[in-house]
């Protein structure tokens, strides 16, 4: 590992990844993050705290957004339409239902769900909002408050994105 730009280390602070403080209070031997990678803005090295499985899911969602969504999304924004033809492809990620366990849902941890939502939003906010309303609002309401019959009736097709959850609001 070649020495690179370093940051200050105070008394009693630990240094990341085996880097060693030099005599001038700076870290040496720390590689900078790769530009454009998810680590690029990981100033606190939080990426080191997630599992390989979480990294793989984050990468899978990021690749989906980069390959399937961002190349086509702008005209949808201009027409004020949602790209419903992407829903079957989105279903293949098996992320609908986020933290709900069972009924075809992935049962993610809160952290994993946050990573997924972050990657969806990074690619396009409308996709993140869509999955947030569908999974976190509609599906979680059924998962927490529905009867077993309602859960069995609605959650499996919603997890496959065959049925879409929504939110309606009226004002007096």
Give, region by region, the residue ranges found by the protein language model.
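Intrinsic disorder at enzyme termini
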Residues: 1-53
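Short basic coil micro-motifs at the edges of alpha-helical modules that engage polyanionic partners
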Residues: 46-47, 54, 79, 105
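A ubiquitous short alpha-helical element
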Residues: 26-28, 53-59, 123-125
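Mature N-terminal segment immediately following signal peptide/propeptide cleavage
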Residues: 48-72
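Alpha-helical interaction segments
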Residues: 33-34, 43-44, 54, 66-67, ...
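Glycine-rich flavin
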Residues: 63, 68-172
């Amino acid at each position: 590992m070649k020495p690179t730009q370093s940051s200050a280390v105070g008394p009693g602070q630990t240094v990341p990844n085996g880097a060693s403080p030099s005599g001038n209070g700076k870290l040496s031997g720390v590689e900078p993050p790769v530009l454009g990678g998810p680590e690029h803005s990981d100033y606190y090295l939080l990426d080191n705290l997630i599992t390989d499985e979480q990294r793989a899911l984050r990468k899978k969602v990021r690749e989906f957004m980069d390959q399937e969504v961002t190349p086509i999304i702008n005209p949808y924004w201009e027409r004020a339409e949602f790209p419903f033809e992407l829903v079957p492809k989105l279903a293949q990620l098996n992320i609908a239902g986020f933290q709900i366990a069972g009924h075809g849902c992935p049962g993610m941890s809160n952290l994993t769900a946050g990573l997924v939502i972050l990657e969806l939003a990074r690619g396009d906010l409308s996709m993140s909002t869509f999955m947030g309303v569908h999974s976190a609002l509609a599906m979680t309401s059924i998962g927490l408050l529905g009867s077993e019959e309602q859960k069995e009736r609605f959650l499996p097709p919603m997890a496959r994105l065959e049925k879409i959850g929504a939110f309606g609001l009226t004002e007096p």
